[in-house]
Amino acid sequence: MALTTWFWVGAVGMLAGTVLPIRDCIRHPSHRRYDLVLAGITGLAAIAYTTMGLGITATTVGDRTVYLARYIDWLVTTPLIVLYLAMLARPGHRTSAWLLAADVFVIAAGIAAALTTGVQRWLFFAVGAAGYAALLYGLLGTLPRALGDDPRVRSLFVTLRNITVVLWTLYPVVWLLSPAGIGILQTEMYTIVVVYLDFISKVAFVAFAVLGADAVSRLVAADAAAPATAEPTPDGD
């Protein structure tokens, strides 16, 4: 099957995933800001896959083709995933900011690794791995400590966080095996694996988030019941 076919499969899958938060937003207008983040995750990914299907943003690095749209997608959508997790945990603005910055740093290092050859790409890969370790600390340690006592919110957060951590940890392994790394995976197989990982890490994330709408309703209700002048967060926000 041609590579472009897999890109179109990814585009259709992401577009289908975008319907879920849009429908939830229509049914529950109070969830709007949560649903807009979710719609951005799959909606922007659908646009990226469409451009790859059309052959746009493809560039040659050495003897391999790099699809810049894929990395631009990750540069935008992975922070949205982190943002959604932070919206559930509510750690404070400064903590959320450094988590988002860490995520962008990791993806930027990945872009640099994809666009370079030789020793440089491995240096950028190592830098990205170090950044990812910091991001994991935030996802596994910092955010859970900030969670409130509501069991529904905690359950939703843990489910989404675990999906994210497990799948995101597979991406660098797949990259190592790809033509950009040691070349065990050929281009078509690498593309298939990434489409599959993207689908689960984005569409499944969005689907579980929408299914957990009750947890979001509880957060919205808590906000509505909170006094106009809120207590300072642990971050001082």
Swiss-Prot record:
<keyword id="KW-1003">Cell membrane</keyword>
<feature type="topological domain" description="Extracellular">
    <location>
        <begin position="1"/>
        <end position="2"/>
    </location>
</feature>
<dbReference type="GO" id="GO:0007602">
    <property type="term" value="P:phototransduction"/>
</dbReference>
<feature type="topological domain" description="Extracellular">
    <location>
        <begin position="116"/>
        <end position="119"/>
    </location>
</feature>
<comment type="subunit">
    <text>Interacts with HTR-II.</text>
</comment>
<keyword id="KW-0716">Sensory transduction</keyword>
<feature type="transmembrane region" description="Helical; Name=Helix C">
    <location>
        <begin position="68"/>
        <end position="89"/>
    </location>
</feature>
<feature type="modified residue" description="N6-(retinylidene)lysine">
    <location>
        <position position="202"/>
    </location>
</feature>
<protein>
    <recommendedName>
        <fullName>Sensory rhodopsin-2</fullName>
    </recommendedName>
</protein>
<feature type="topological domain" description="Extracellular">
    <location>
        <begin position="54"/>
        <end position="67"/>
    </location>
</feature>
<keyword id="KW-0812">Transmembrane</keyword>
<feature type="transmembrane region" description="Helical; Name=Helix F">
    <location>
        <begin position="151"/>
        <end position="178"/>
    </location>
</feature>
<keyword id="KW-0600">Photoreceptor protein</keyword>
<feature type="transmembrane region" description="Helical; Name=Helix A">
    <location>
        <begin position="3"/>
        <end position="23"/>
    </location>
</feature>
<keyword id="KW-0681">Retinal protein</keyword>
<keyword id="KW-0157">Chromophore</keyword>
<dbReference type="GO" id="GO:0009881">
    <property type="term" value="F:photoreceptor activity"/>
</dbReference>
<dbReference type="InterPro" id="IPR001425">
    <property type="entry name" value="Arc/bac/fun_rhodopsins"/>
</dbReference>
<dbReference type="GO" id="GO:0005886">
    <property type="term" value="C:plasma membrane"/>
</dbReference>
<feature type="topological domain" description="Cytoplasmic">
    <location>
        <begin position="215"/>
        <end position="237"/>
    </location>
</feature>
<feature type="topological domain" description="Extracellular">
    <location>
        <begin position="179"/>
        <end position="186"/>
    </location>
</feature>
<keyword id="KW-0675">Receptor</keyword>
<dbReference type="Pfam" id="PF01036">
    <property type="entry name" value="Bac_rhodopsin"/>
</dbReference>
<comment type="function">
    <text>Photophobic photoreceptor responsible for the negative phototaxis. Activates the sensory rhodopsin II transducer (HTR-II) in response to blue light.</text>
</comment>
<comment type="similarity">
    <text>Belongs to the archaeal/bacterial/fungal opsin family.</text>
</comment>
<feature type="transmembrane region" description="Helical; Name=Helix D">
    <location>
        <begin position="93"/>
        <end position="115"/>
    </location>
</feature>
<feature type="topological domain" description="Cytoplasmic">
    <location>
        <begin position="148"/>
        <end position="150"/>
    </location>
</feature>
<feature type="topological domain" description="Cytoplasmic">
    <location>
        <begin position="90"/>
        <end position="92"/>
    </location>
</feature>
<keyword id="KW-0472">Membrane</keyword>
<feature type="transmembrane region" description="Helical; Name=Helix E">
    <location>
        <begin position="120"/>
        <end position="147"/>
    </location>
</feature>
<keyword id="KW-1133">Transmembrane helix</keyword>
<dbReference type="InterPro" id="IPR018229">
    <property type="entry name" value="Rhodopsin_retinal_BS"/>
</dbReference>
<feature type="transmembrane region" description="Helical; Name=Helix G">
    <location>
        <begin position="187"/>
        <end position="214"/>
    </location>
</feature>
<dbReference type="GO" id="GO:0005216">
    <property type="term" value="F:monoatomic ion channel activity"/>
</dbReference>
<feature type="topological domain" description="Cytoplasmic">
    <location>
        <begin position="24"/>
        <end position="31"/>
    </location>
</feature>
<feature type="transmembrane region" description="Helical; Name=Helix B">
    <location>
        <begin position="32"/>
        <end position="53"/>
    </location>
</feature>
